Swiss-Prot record:
It comes from the Bacteria. Coiled coil: none annotated. One of its GO terms (biological process) is translation. It comes from Streptococcus pyogenes serotype M1. CDD domains: Ribosomal_L29_HIP. Pfam families: Ribosomal_L29. Belongs to the universal ribosomal protein uL29 family. This is Large ribosomal subunit protein uL29. PROSITE patterns: RIBOSOMAL_L29. Signal peptide: none annotated. GO terms for molecular function: structural constituent of ribosome. Keywords: Ribonucleoprotein, Ribosomal protein.
């Protein structure tokens, strides 16, 4: 992700409620699980996507803790 995309993603997250953030986190965790499964099977072409999803999950958790 480019810097502007990251800023837009975080801005979008800050506009969500706690429930929506939890839903977003679950979606990202499911995507991470699927990506890991593909990587283990040797089918994953864009391995950098694993790191992107992990960082997005961390961003969601950061915004959640900011809201508390």
């Amino acid at each position: 992700m480019k810097l502007q995309e990251i800023k837009d993603f975080v801005k979008e997250l800050r506009g969500l409620s706690q429930e929506e953030l939890a839903k977003k986190e679950n979606e990202l965790k499911k995507e991470l699980f699927d990506l890991r499964f593909q990587a283990a099977a040797g089918q994953l072409e864009k391995t950098a996507r694993l790191d992107e999803v992990k960082k997005q999950i961390a961003r969601v958790k950061t915004v959640q803790s900011e809201m508390k």
